[in-house]
C-alpha cells in the first residue's frame, strides 16, 4: 500500500453533486442515489448512471439506472415496494416503546438475540428458541449497545471500526477542554455512548449528544431525541422531516453556540459526497443566524493518505498527528510501530495549537509549526515544517525539493522519489483528462465541474466499471431473470 497512498490514478468514473441532482435522483433502500459519469480526456464518455450512495459493491445494493432511462409506472411502484421491504421492521417510536417495556422487566427476563441482533420481550422468546441468546442483560449493558451489537464490517458501505477506549477518552477530553457542550456524532457510536454515560453520572460540565448513523439497530436503545437513522453519503434522514427537525433543533440550541460535529466515516467511502453532506449539516446549524460568518466546527477521522482530497473540499482544514485506533481492527491499533501504526488521523478546522496531544504517548509541541506532532515527526528546516504523515521520520530529497518516506529513493529515470523496486518509465504519469504531462488529474485546469462550480470527485471503483462491461452470452439469461425479479 505504501507505493499507492495518495495516488491520483483512477478508472475515470466521477460523481456529480448538487442539490438539484440529489433531489431528482431515484431512490434505493439507502435513500437518494448518486449520479455518476465516465470521463476521459476531459469529456464525458457514454451515458450517466445512478447507483447507490452507500454501497460501492453491487452485491450489497444492486441498484443501477441510466439517467436517461424511461422508467414505467409499474417499475416505479415495484421499486418503491422493494425499498419499503428493505427498511427496518419497526419505526423508531415502536423500538422506543419496546425498549421501555424491556427495561421494566426483571433481570432474569431481559434477553438479547445475538443472531438477530434484537432485544427480546417474553412474547418473542419462542420464535428465537433455536438462536444464540444472551440472558440477564443489565441496565449498564443497555447503556453500551456497541458492545452488544456485532459491528458491521463492510468497509465500502457501513464499516463499524469502533474507537478504542484510548481514542474515545482523548476525544472526550478534547471536547471538554475546548468548551463544546453539544456533539453531533456522525457515525461515532462509541463517543455517543461515552458522552451519555458521563451525563448519567452527573459529570460537569454537562454535554449533550445526538447520534446520526446508518445502523438502524441503535433505534432499539435510544430515544428519538438521541438517535437518527442517517446516511452520511447522501444526507438522507430515513425518519423523514421529523428526524431532520430533531437534528436541526439539536444544532440550533443556544443559537448554535457550543456545537461540534465529530465524524468517523467508512474508510472506503468517497470523500466528496461525505463533504457535501457535512456542508449541509453546517447549513442546518447556520439556519438560525445566516449572517454568522463562522462555521460548525468539525473533527473528521480518516486515513492520512486522503489528506489532499479532504483539503480540496475543506481548504481550511488541518491534519493532526494524533493516531486514532480501533478495538475491532486488526491493524489500526495503538502501540504498533513503523507502517503498522494506525493511518487514521483527525482533520479539523479548529486551531491545531489548541488541540493538546498527550505527551505520555510521545507527542510534543513544535513551536515553529505551532502544533503538536508525534515523536517520529522531525521538523525539516528546508521545508520549514514537520513533514511526516505516517509517524516515521521522513527524509528530505534535494532533487524533489520535498521530504519523502524513508523507504523511498530518488529515481533519475522517473525524476522523482519512489520505492526502489518501482517500475520505471513515464507510463501512468501526467493527467488522464487532458493528456498533459505537467500535472495530475486533480490539478487539471480543464477539470469538469458540477452545476454549482464544485469539483466532481473521481470514484475509485472497479466494481461499477466492471458492471458496465459487456457480459458473456451465457450470463444473459441470468441477467434478464434478475432484472425481472429486482425492480
From Swiss-Prot:
Q: Which PROSITE patterns match?
A: DHHC, N6_MTASE, ZF_GRF
Q: Name one GO molecular function term.
A: S-adenosyl-L-methionine binding
A GO BP term here is:
rRNA methylation
Broad class of where this protein is predominantly found: cytoplasm
Q: Where is this region: Disordered?
A: 445-487
Output compositional bias ranges, type Basic residues.
477-487
- Per UniProt, Zn(2+) 4 binds at 380, 383, 396, 403
What role does this protein play?
A: rRNA N6-methyltransferase that specifically methylates the adenine in position 4220 of 28S rRNA. N6-methylation of adenine(4220) in 28S rRNA is required for translation.
Q: What is this protein called?
A: rRNA N(6)-adenosine-methyltransferase ZCCHC4
Amino acid at each position: 500500500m505504501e507505493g499507492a497512498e495518495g495516488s491520483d490514478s483512477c478508472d475515470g468514473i466521477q460523481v456529480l453533486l448538487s442539490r438539484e441532482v440529489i433531489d431528482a435522483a431515484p431512490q434505493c433502500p439507502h435513500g437518494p442515489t448518486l449520479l455518476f459519469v465516465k470521463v476521459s480526456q476531459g469529456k464525458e464518455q457514454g451515458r450517466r448512471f445512478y447507483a447507490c450512495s452507500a454501497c460501492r459493491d453491487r452485491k450489497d445494493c444492486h441498484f443501477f439506472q441510466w439517467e436517461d432511462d424511461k422508467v414505467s409506472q409499474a417499475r416505479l411502484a415495484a421499486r418503491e415496494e422493494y425499498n419499503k421491504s428493505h427498511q427496518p421492521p419497526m419505526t423508531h417510536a415502536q423500538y422506543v416503546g419496546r425498549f421501555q417495556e424491556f427495561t421494566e422487566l426483571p433481570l432474569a427476563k431481559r434477553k438479547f438475540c445475538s443472531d438477530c441482533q434484537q432485544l427480546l420481550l417474553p412474547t418473542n422468546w419462542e420464535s428465537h428458541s433455536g438462536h444464540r441468546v444472551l440472558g440477564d442483560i443489565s441496565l449498564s449493558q443497555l447503556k453500551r449497545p456497541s458492545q452488544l451489537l456485532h459491528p458491521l464490517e463492510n468497509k465500502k458501505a457501513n464499516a463499524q471500526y469502533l474507537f478504542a477506549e484510548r481514542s474515545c477518552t482523548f476525544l472526550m477530553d478534547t471536547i471538554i477542554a475546548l468548551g463544546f457542550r453539544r456533539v453531533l456524532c456522525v457515525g461515532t457510536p462509541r463517543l455517543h455512548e461515552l458522552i451519555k454515560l458521563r451525563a448519567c453520572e452527573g459529570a460537569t460540565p454537562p454535554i449533550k449528544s445526538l447520534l446520526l448513523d446508518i445502523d438502524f439497530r441503535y433505534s432499539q436503545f435510544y430515544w428519538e431525541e438521541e438517535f437518527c437513522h442517517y446516511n452520511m453519503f447522501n444526507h438522507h434522514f430515513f425518519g423523514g422531516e421529523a428526524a431532520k427537525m430533531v437534528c436541526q433543533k439539536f444544532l440550533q440550541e443556544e443559537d448554535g453556540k457550543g456545537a461540534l460535529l465529530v465524524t468517523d466515516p467508512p474508510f472506503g467511502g468517497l470523500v466528496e459526497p461525505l463533504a457535501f453532506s457535512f456542508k449541509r449539516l453546517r447549513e442546518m446549524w447556520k439556519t438560525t443566524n445566516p449572517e454568522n460568518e463562522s462555521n460548525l466546527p468539525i473533527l473528521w477521522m480518516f486515513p492520512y493518505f486522503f489528506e489532499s482530497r479532504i483539503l480540496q473540499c475543506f481548504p481550511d482544514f488541518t491534519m493532526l498527528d494524533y493516531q486514532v485506533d480501533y478495538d475491532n481492527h486488526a491493524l489500526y491499533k495503538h502501540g504498533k510501530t513503523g507502517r503498522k501504526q494506525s493511518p487514521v488521523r483527525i482533520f479539523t478546522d479548529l486551531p491545531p495549537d489548541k488541540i493538546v496531544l498527550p505527551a505520555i504517548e510521545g507527542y510534543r509541541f513544535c513551536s515553529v509549526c505551532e502544533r503538536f506532532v508525534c515523536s517520529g515527526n522531525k521538523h525539516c528546516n528546508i521545508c520549514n515544517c514537520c513533514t511526516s504523515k505516517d509517524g516515521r521520520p521522513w527524509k528530505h530529497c534535494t532533487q524533489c525539493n520535498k521530504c519523502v518516506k524513508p523507504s523511498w529513493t530518488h529515481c533519475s529515470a522517473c525524476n522523482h522519489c519512489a520505492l526502489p523496486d518501482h517500475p520505471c518509465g513515464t507510463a501512468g504519469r501526467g493527467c488522464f483528462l487532458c493528456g498533459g504531462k505537467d500535472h495530475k488529474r486533480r490539478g487539471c485546469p480543464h477539470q469538469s465541474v458540477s452545476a454549482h462550480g464544485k469539483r466532481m470527485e473521481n470514484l475509485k471503483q472497479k466494481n461499477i466499471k466492471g458492471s458496465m462491461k459487456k457480459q458473456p452470452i451465457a450470463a444473459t439469461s441470468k441477467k434478464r431473470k434478475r432484472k425481472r425479479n429486482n425492480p
